[in-house]
């Protein structure tokens, strides 16, 4: 009838969502910072924000968002949404253990440095396709990847503005061309919330303030 703090749910959950709180001696589940997700946090001025754990990630490796759901309960076709584009359109981000059929809300871009057989066990047969795509990304895919960890606000739509060609090489026998495109992210209301370029800009510190940023 109540949690007794055996922590079995913590051991069994593949996503490690339940957390054991020592002060109350019960297991509690992550609530996904729902006031921030729903735009109810008074500090966010109505903008829907990522969870705190996403915002605290120091690496540019996480992207959180919301997708449209159709009348049939499935994801509505929306390639302008960065999550839909990466997961359903390009199939670069994959679900964990797809053979279990749980369809999680967490998707992962498999690493090319991990043994391929191990990645296939975790993410299924789409691993080769995913790695092949982001190893030699086209302009759209490279643009969307620039949006990772650029803002705490949830991006509902993205757009790429063409830029000049800045680099060209061959990767595993495939031609790769890089363009300094500008990628723009928009919130649910269509307002621009982030604008980044593919090439990271250089900032020159003035001589009179050598320690300034």
At which residue positions do the language-model features occur?
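Long, compositionally biased charged/polar accessory segments in the mid-to-C-terminal portions
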Residues: 54-213
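Iron-sulfur cluster-binding cysteine motifs and their immediate structural context
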Residues: 1-27, 32, 39-72, 84-86, ...
